[in-house]
């Protein structure tokens, strides 16, 4: 399954473009722009599993840095600052990674 099976390709393109500048990433705005906020809980979980590149059941910090590439292969990597900010917002239990429920909460709070 690809991201465009779940989200509109044009919405993804616009959202990735909106955050092309380093240190401009805002996960709340991004999730709204790609249409993730409006998706069902099941679809949000499917997006999580696409972003979980190593299929560990978690999005670890190294995967988080490439989150935009999970939506669009030609997107930029997040800066270290952006990655840490996103991890802090999503990692509710402090284990250094984001699980599917934490990701769902992160999207819902957007």
UniProtKB/Swiss-Prot annotation:
The UniProt record lists the keyword Acetylation: yes
Gene3D superfamilies recorded: EF-hand (1.10.238.10)
Family: Belongs to the parvalbumin family.
In-chain residues carrying the UniProt-annotated modification N-acetylserine: 2
Keywords, ordered alphabetically: Acetylation, Calcium, Metal-binding, Muscle protein, Phosphoprotein, Repeat
CDD domains: EFh_parvalbumin_alpha (cd16254)
GO cellular component terms, A-Z: cytoplasm
Pfam families: EF-hand_7 (PF13499)
Protein purpose: In muscle, parvalbumin is thought to be involved in relaxation after contraction. It binds two calcium ions.
Listed name of the protein: Parvalbumin alpha
Binding sites annotated in the UniProt record for Ca(2+) 2: 91, 93, 95, 97, 102
Annotated positions binding Ca(2+) 1: 52, 54, 56, 58, 60, 63
Organism of this sequence: Macaca fuscata fuscata
Superkingdom of origin organism: Eukaryota
């Amino acid at each position: 399954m690809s991201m465009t099976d779940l989200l509109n390709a044009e919405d993804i393109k616009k959202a990735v473009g909106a955050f092309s500048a380093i240190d401009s990433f805002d996960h709340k705005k991004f999730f709204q722009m790609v249409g993730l906020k409006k998706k069902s809980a099941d679809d949000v979980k499917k997006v999580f599993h696409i972003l979980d590149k190593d299929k560990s059941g978690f999005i670890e910090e190294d995967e988080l840095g490439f989150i935009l590439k999970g939506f669009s292969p030609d997107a930029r990597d997040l800066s270290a600052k952006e990655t840490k900010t996103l991890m802090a917002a999503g990692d509710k239990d402090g284990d250094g990674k984001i699980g599917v429920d934490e990701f769902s909460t992160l999207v819902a709070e957007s």
